[in-house]
């Protein structure tokens, strides 16, 4: 399977010109973080802003819900060009209900695991979801450095998926750059913000990141 790249935006209003520039690249997704001010302290990205993003981009959205009650978001998100909705486990809504609701709309489902969480909390859901999002920084704040222990977590998760004969994808989000991406060969999707957006050539950055995890 071709390794994928998701260009990330953490709650800031995304300039139309940036989205337009990404349209002419082969980036796979626009990764959007949504925060409710409860799961994490920061509050961002109302639904109206997400709607605006889809007006300017042809890319599918990869939505990361850092919220306590994801269920109330799903119906609205289903009206947009959303590929996958990722939620966290330590929330108020029932995970199985979230999975069922996403399936109803034909939307893929992901579960995020934070740096301080052990992999085994994911095990009951691995055969029910499409993706695991390994957080390589603590959720909610931009500009953090990549946490090196995330590499071992990704490698261990890959072994667990092989053992179970599952095709669940592994995505990694947080502080991903050209230096650490080469150690993320067991990831299927790299989520990267500033490495792409702050580069002079978006396509060049995307190509380099993809090569880092392609065998």
Each model region followed by its residue ranges:
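Hydrophobic faces of well-ordered beta-strands that scaffold small-molecule active sites
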Residues: 3-8, 30-32, 61-65, 83-87, ...
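Glycine-enriched alpha-helix->loop->beta-strand junction motifs that scaffold or abut catalytic
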Residues: 25-29, 56-59, 78-85, 101-110, ...
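Glycine-rich phosphate-binding active-site loops on the catalytic face of alpha/beta enzymes
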Residues: 85-93, 133-143, 187-206
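Active-site beta-loop-alpha junctions enriched in small/polar residues
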Residues: 8-12, 35-37, 66-70, 90, ...
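Conserved, mostly hydrophobic/aromatic
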Residues: 22, 32-33, 77, 132, ...
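N-terminal active-site wall of soluble small-molecule enzyme domains
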Residues: 31-101
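Catalytic cores of alpha/beta
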Residues: 16-22, 69-79, 117-128, 174-190
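Glycine/Thr-rich beta-alpha phosphate-binding loop at enzyme active sites
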Residues: 36-44, 48, 115, 125-159, ...
């Amino acid at each position: 399977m071709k390794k994928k790249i998701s260009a990330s935006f953490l709650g800031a209003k995304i300039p139309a010109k940036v989205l337009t520039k990404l349209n002419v690249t082969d980036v796979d997704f626009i990764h959007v973080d949504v925060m409710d001010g409860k799961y994490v302290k920061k509050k961002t990205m109302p639904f109206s802003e997400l709607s605006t993003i889809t007006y300017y981009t042809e890319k599918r959205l990869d939505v990361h819900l850092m919220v306590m009650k994801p269920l109330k978001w799903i119906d609205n998100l289903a009206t947009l060009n959303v590929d996958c909705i990722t939620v966290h486990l330590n929330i108020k809504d029932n995970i199985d209900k979230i999975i069922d609701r996403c399936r109803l709309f034909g939307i893929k489902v992901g579960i995020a695991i934070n740096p301080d969480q052990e992999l085994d909390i994911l095990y009951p859901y691995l055969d029910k979801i499409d993706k695991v999002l390994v957080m390589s920084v603590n959720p909610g704040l931009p500009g953090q450095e990549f946490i090196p222990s995330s590499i071992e977590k990704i490698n261990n998760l890959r072994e667990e998926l092989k053992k179970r004969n599952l095709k669940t994808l592994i995505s990694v989000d947080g502080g991903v750059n050209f230096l650490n991406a080469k150690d993320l060969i067991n990831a299927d999707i790299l989520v990267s913000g500033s490495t792409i957006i702050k580069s002079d050539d978006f396509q060049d950055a995307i190509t380099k990141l993809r090569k880092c995890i392609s065998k």
